[in-house]
Amino acid sequence: MSRYKGPSLRIIRRLGELPGLTRKVVKKRKYPPGQHGQKSRKRSEYAIRLEEKQKLRYNYGLTERQLVQCVRRAKQMKGSTGQILLQLLEMRLDNIVFRLGMAPTIPASRQLVNHGHICVNNKVVSIPSYQCKPGDIITVKERNASKKIVETNLLFPGLANLPSHLEFDKSKLQGKVNDIIQREWVALEVNELLIVEFYSR
């Protein structure tokens, strides 16, 4: 399954606010979009778990294959699989750039990374899924075009609050990863346990 590139409003109307996908916010209705959406019926356990999984996939801009790989990796690590899964996704370079305010959304952040505008420890890294770790320094490439894009993005950051595991110096356009993100700083409202259950069926 490929990465979603369609209208974001339809997705957030169905799944609720997805801060990584878009800044747009719509009131979530009691029924899904579409002409048959108002028909009420009891949702199955599968449907509930699927919705939580879809929240994660669309918010972080992952393909189904990428998400499956993250779940498998989380299961192999010690600790709560659900929380480790969220940490793996939050520590991706495209998400770190987004959380630092260098891009308004994760898709915009991914584009910055893909186009070689972002450096990690003074080396250009063009892989959005690159796993950042404590001690990593995130900077903008020493190029006027790169700096201009990020300076403009900083005027309208996607999320107002900088997570406790990150620090950012606007004057230098430099961020630092100080720690692994804690669960309370994950901006997406999601039940990660249901996602683990979905892939354990």
Swiss-Prot record:
InterPro entries: Ribosomal_uS4, Ribosomal_uS4_bac-type, Ribosomal_uS4_CS, Ribosomal_uS4_N, S4_RNA-bd, S4_RNA-bd_sf. GO terms for molecular function: rRNA binding; structural constituent of ribosome. GO terms for cellular component: cyanelle; small ribosomal subunit. Keywords: Cyanelle, Plastid, Ribonucleoprotein, Ribosomal protein, RNA-binding, rRNA-binding. It is found in: Plastid, Cyanelle. It comes from the Eukaryota. Residues 91-153 form the S4 RNA-binding domain. The keyword GTP-binding does not apply. SMART domains: Ribosomal_S4 (SM01390), S4 (SM00363). One of its GO terms (biological process) is ribosomal small subunit biogenesis. Part of the 30S ribosomal subunit. Contacts protein S5. The interaction surface between S4 and S5 is involved in control of translational fidelity. HAMAP family: Ribosomal_uS4_B (MF_01306_B). Belongs to the universal ribosomal protein uS4 family. One of the primary rRNA binding proteins, it binds directly to 16S rRNA where it nucleates assembly of the body of the 30S subunit. With S5 and S12 plays an important role in translational accuracy. This is Small ribosomal subunit protein uS4c.
